[in-house]
């Protein structure tokens, strides 16, 4: 089970030819007060996986018959939750959501070092156990002209 409605994450699963179901966890992805970026992505990956588990449990409960209720919660799933943030100069960069914000963010990243933190959580619904990792990688942006930024944004439209 993929605990995400992200087209990007679904594309990865599709490229891997995985047989999966995508469930939108529909959680609040806001950072907590003074929460470090690493802690944020780890918390969100686990929260997404657990939210998907709750959705699956509710679905099983709703579709099971009275006779079958005792087995409704015995199905087991492996749920993948993930999150990613970018960090520039120690500050978390949020999703731009529109062209103007994306342009400002790329202009700010131009010529700078940007660290991307990606979390991955594998949650086992049968045992309630999980494995979680956060992987950082750093990208050194070359200086970008406004025209280069515009061309990229018009082609890719990376707003979500």
Please give the residue ranges for each predicted region.
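Anionic-ligand binding patches
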Residues: 14, 38-60, 64-160
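A short beta-strand-loop structural module common to alpha/beta enzyme folds
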Residues: 21-30
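Accessory recognition modules or surfaces
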Residues: 2, 33-34, 40
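N-terminal beta1-alpha1 ligand-phosphate binding loop
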Residues: 1-18
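A short acidic, helix-capping loop that chelates divalent metal ions and anchors anionic groups
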Residues: 29-33, 88-90
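Cofactor-binding loop segments of dinucleotide-utilizing enzymes, especially the Rossmann-like FAD-
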Residues: 5, 25, 125
